UniProtKB/Swiss-Prot annotation:
Known role: Usually encoded in the trnK tRNA gene intron. Probably assists in splicing its own and other chloroplast group II introns.
PANTHER family found in the cross-reference section: MATURASE K
Protein name as annotated: Maturase K
Keywords associated with the record: Chloroplast, mRNA processing, Plastid, RNA-binding, tRNA processing
Pfam families: Intron_maturas2 (PF01348), MatK_N (PF01824)
Broad class of the protein's primary localization: plastid
Family recorded in the similarity comment: Belongs to the intron maturase 2 family. MatK subfamily.
GO terms for biological process, alphabetical: mRNA processing; RNA splicing; tRNA processing
Lineage, highest ranks first: Eukaryota, Viridiplantae, Streptophyta, Embryophyta, Tracheophyta
Compartment list: Plastid, Chloroplast
One Gene Ontology molecular-function label: RNA binding
Transmembrane segments: none
Amino acid sequence: MEELQGYLEIDRSRQQHFLYPLLFQEYIYALAHDHGLNGSIFYEPMENFGYDNKSSSLIVKRLITRMHQQNHLILSVNDSNESIFVGHNKNFYFQMVSEGFAVIMEIPFSLRLVSSLEEKEIAKSHNSRSIHSIFPFFEDKLSHLNHVSDILIPHPIHLEILVQTLHCWIQDAPSLHLLRFFLHEYRNSNSLITPKKSISLFSKENQRFFLLLYNSHVYECESVLVFLRKQSSHLRSTSSGTFLERTHFYGKIEHLVVVLRNDFQKTLWLFKDPFMHYVRYQGKSILASKGTHLLMKKWKSHLVHFWQCHFYLWSLPDRIHINQLYNHFLYFLGYLSSVRLNTSVVRIQMLENSFLIDTSINKFETLVPIIPLIGSVAKAKFCNVSGHPISKSVRADSSDSDIINRFGRIYRNLSHYHSGSSKKQTLYRIKYILRLSCARTLARKHKSTVRAFLKRLGSEFLEEFLTEEEQVLSLIFQRTSSPSYRSHRERIWYLDIIRINDLANHS
């Protein structure tokens, strides 16, 4: 039990006590502007809120002045419904404060990361943050395993649980009170809490702020997996060192907040499995094992009980699915992954005798699902639900080259993300949709026909939709008889992709 106590201890020397005053510093909002995620408030057009870019610094100074006033950051018990963000710019001010608040709250986790890397002498590699690095790991590990569990991590049902989760990391009471105020204020005035009381995390506004809260919640949910995995393994497990999303905390620190101590050692043997692997991206995780179906059911039961006891979450049975790898497609990060048994016959000639040997190899395959991808493209209004390309409305002052570059960039980014597909037919279908949608958009702008417009542009229009992968592969396989066939089946994984493509995110 002494080792268990080590997991329950919190390193208080690194907890921050003076984060709240940083909220009144102008450079914090500059950091939020420079390092914010795409889609945050600072990357939205300022004219949408009635301001231009030149006055953004003035807005921050005005906001800090308002916060210095005594009544603006104090939540009164008697006037709990009164908002500090009065006026028609309430949402805008709230989003600015939440962006700066997220930058401040990330400071303790950044310090933990630096300290963890120094103690373990781990080089900080940006390549390990790529979500594409998961698939080579799958290819190396999953082909030798038997069962896989698709897990949807439940959302926090109560706001106070989110605050208490961060309380374990941060001892700055004013910051925690402000966080509690933010959550209740936004719940009362917006759609933070849905009718089912689940958190709306990945909205375009306040994305960094909600990612911080969500990542802390997910870390607590999976902490029990890290602890049990280390206890059950015959060899000492190695921390991954990084998370996958950009604003994750990048350090999987091995400690357990709450563990049932009764009959602990007696229960632990039920989960012993030296071939257990766990990966996660956002709210979906995968638990793969070489063990039996019974072992996976025990893991499922343990996770459900842990979430119920620790987070007061009632996890539905359909949030954890257990399947065999050999007859199941694993949907993860916009790919359909599977393990297929490939058989081949090898003829061996030895002097006067010859032998035929049957060999079977487990091959990991990744495919792009066509129906969900077309649904995402249709949702972005490039085509209808049947996949028929349609024109998009554009600004009258947009040049033809800008429109073509925009459509070409969308396809290149999508093709770049799905470059690991074993079959490229789905991407060619998407290329056709985007190319024809672009042509229809330009023809609509010039009040012409698509045929006449394509005839006028010629090959220059087609080159905009030629990806770097196709150019490189055409050079590599230019001496072979069928370079197109080779390029159709070549899988390429990139180590610079740190977030899922918006069109590939079908959830």
